[in-house]
Amino acid sequence: MSTPENPDPVDTTTQDAAAAIVAEEGTPPSESLRDEYEQLADLVRKYRYAYYQEDSPTVSDAEFDELYRRLEELEALHPELVSNDSPTQEVGGEVSSAFAAVEHLQRMYSLDDVFSLDELEAWVRKAEASVAKLGDSVPPIAWLTELKIDGLAVNLLYRDGKLVRAATRGDGTTGEDITHNVLTIKEIPRQLSGSGYPSEVEIRGEVFIPSKAFLEFNESLVAAGKAPLANPRNAAAGSLRQKDPAETAKRPLSMFVHGIGAREGLDAKSQSESYKLLEEWGLPVSPYLKVLETFDDVLKFIADYGERRHKLVHEIDGIVVKIDDFATQRALGYTSRVPRWAAAYKYPPEEVHTKLLDIAVNVGRTGRVTPFGLMEPVKVAGSTVGMATLHNQDVVKAKGVMIGDIVILRKAGDVIPEIVGPVLALRDKQEPPVREFVMPTECPSCGTPLAPAKESDVDIRCPNAKSCPSQLRERVFHVASRGAFDIEALGWEAAVALTQPAEPETPPLTSEARLFSLTREDLADVLIRREKRSKGVGTGEYELVPYFYTKGTAKSPSKPTATTEKLFAELEKAKQQPLWRVLVALSIRHVGPTASRALATAFGSMDAIRNATEEQMAHVDGVGPTIAVALKEWFAVDWHNEIVDSWAAAGVRMEDERDASVPRTLEGLTVVVTGTLPNFSRDEAKEAIIIRGGKASGSVSKNTSYLVAGESAGTKLDKAEQLGVPVLDEDGFRELLANGPAQTGTEAEAATDEATVVDETAAEAATE
C-alpha cells in the first residue's frame, strides 16, 4: 500500500502516453509503440514485484488493472510483441531468494479477472459455447460460486496424510518453502483426519487474517508504540515471510482451502464433491459457497455478498465462478496463465463522502514530490481511512479537488484508498471556504527549488538527492529492504532515527555511505519524537525518547537495546551479500533485482560494471539501453562513487568470487536446473553455470539450451520435452560443465530417455 511516508505512485507519463497509442490490427508496431509497450511491461513487472515480493503494493488495484489491460490490448493488436517473459504470460510473482525454492507437483494458475457484470456474462457465454462443443461427454454446467479471499495463495503437500511441505504460489511453477511458518496456523492439520485421502495430494488455499482479528492486532501494535499494519492482505503475506516462525505464531492467521492440485487416487468428480472430502479430512473449507444452475443465480449470489461483504469474517475482493465438474474442467484446460473454466468477478469500489482537510506533500527516494490528501477519518470497505495519495499535481487538477471540499472516497479493489473527486453541489456550503492546492516550489524537506527531471515530465522532483533528508531516509530504508541487503532491524522508524532524529541536530547518517561504518557510540544520543499513549490511544502529546539505547536509571545505565544489537549483527552479515543485492541497494533508477543479477553475472565485480561502456552493458541479456544509460549517469556522479568506495572500505563485498582457471564452456548458453541433484544444491548448480559463462534461468522457453533434470523434476521437464529442449541428468550436466555442448550430444539423448520416466509426484519436495 502506498503511504505518504513511502509513496511510489504510478508513472502517469508512461500511462498517459500508452493510453494515447492508436494502432490498427495487423499493422506492424512502430518503434515508438514498441518502446511504450516495453515501458508498460516494465511498470507492470515493477508493481507486481512490490505486491508479491515486498508485500507492499505501490499503486491501487484499479491502477494496476488499467495498466495490465492496456498491455493486453497492445498484445491483442500486435501478437508479435508477446514473449515468454511478458507479464501477461506469467503467474503472480517471482520467488524470493529469502526462502528455499520448491517446485509444485502441479502448476498453480492465476484467475481471469472481469470488472463488470457485462464482462462476466460474456465470459460465461463463451464458456457455455465451449462446453456445448463437447457434446454429451460432459454433464450440463453447474457453477460453483465462492468468495475471492484477499489473502496469500498457499500450496499444502500431504503424503500419507501428513503435511510435509507448504509453499507460496510464486510464479505458479516454483514457490517459496514456508512450511515452518504455516505449521503455526492452528486451522491447518499436520495429519489429515479420517480415511480415503490420496497417498499424495496438493491442497490449495488462501491464508488470511480475519477482519476483527486484524483490527485487534493493530490496536496491540499501536499500544506498544509500533506502526500499525497497512491492510489484512499485506499483513498475512508478510507474516508468512517472517524468518522466525515464532514471530509468525504471534499473527492471527487463518486459512480456507479451495482447490486440489496433483493427487493420486482422488475419487471426487467435481469441485463441490472435493470440498466435502476436504472437510472430512479436517481441512478448513469456506462456508460461503454455493453450486448454482443458472447465470441469474450467480448474479443474485454476487449481489447478495456485495451488500454484506464488509460484515464477513474476512476481506474479499470479488467472487470466483468455476465450472463445477472436473471432467469439463479437464476438457477446457488452461491458457498459459489461467484456467478456461474459472473467472474472478471484482466488485466496483465502494464509495463514501468525507471532508478533505488538507493536501500535503512527501518527498520520495528518487526526489519525486507526491501530494496526498488528509481527510476526516471515515469508514470505507471495512476500515477507517484518513489519508490517500494524489500522485502528482496533474492528478489533483484532473480530479478537480480543492482543500475543504467534501470528496468521494473509495478503496480500489477494496484495499487502496483513492480520492475520486469532489461533491460539487456541496462546495459553496463549506466553511471556511475551499481553497486551491498549490504545489510547493521548494522542497519541504530541504528547501531546494523543485523542477521536473525532464521538460516533459509530469512529476516534479527535488534535485538535491545527496543532502535532502527525506530522500536519504527513503534510500536508507530501501537499503534494508528484502530485495537489497535484507536488514530486518532497519525498519522505517530506524531509518527516521538515523537520518531525521529530533536530536542531535547532526544525524548519525548524512549519507548512506556511512551506514556500514556506524558504531554503537554514534547512536547513543539519538532521540525521536513519539506520541504519548493512554490505553492504546494517542493523546496528541509528544515526548522525546531514546531510540537505539535504553533510557537508563541510577541502577541500570543506558545501553544499546536488543534491537540495536540485532541491527549491528545484521549489518555485519549484510557485508557478505552477493553483488546483485549491493546493486539493488544503490537505488539506481530502473535497476531492480532482475537487471542486477544480469549485471553481476556478466561483469562479476562493481569495478567492472563501473568501467564498462554503455554499449557493453546494453548488450547484457536483461539490461538493455535504458538501464545502461541510467547506470552510466549514476556512476558519473562523484558522491555516488563515494558510497560504493565507503561500503567497500567497510568490508561490503563488491565482487562475486570466481575462479579464473575455470573454462568458459557455457558461453552463450541458457541452462535451467530443476529437481533434486544428488551432488549439487540449487545455488551450487546455478553458480557452476554462471562461472562458466552461461545464464542460469528459472524457466524453460524456446531459448533454453539445456534442462538439467534431477529427481522429482516436475512440470519444467514436460515443457522442455514439448519444446524439444535437450535434457541432461547429473552426469550429463557434469559433462556439459567440463567440455561444453560439443561433447554432450549422445549424453543428452540418453539423459532425456532416463529423465522422462521420472515420476514427478513420487519424490521428496522438488527444488528448482
From Swiss-Prot:
It comes from the Bacteria. Residues 746-768 have a biased composition (Low complexity). It holds the Pfam family DNA_ligase_ZBD. NAD(+) binds at residues 61-65, 110-111, 146, 169, 206, 322, 346. It is an enzyme of class 6 (ligase). SUPFAM superfamilies: BRCT domain, DNA ligase/mRNA capping enzyme, catalytic domain, Nucleic acid-binding proteins, RuvA domain 2-like. One of its GO terms (molecular function) is metal ion binding. Residues 661-750 form the BRCT domain. The keyword Chloroplast does not apply. Belongs to the NAD-dependent DNA ligase family. LigA subfamily. NCBIfam families: dnlj, PRK07956.1. HAMAP family: DNA_ligase_A. This is DNA ligase. The lineage of its organism: Bacteria, Bacillati, Actinomycetota, Actinomycetes, Micrococcales. The gene is ligA.
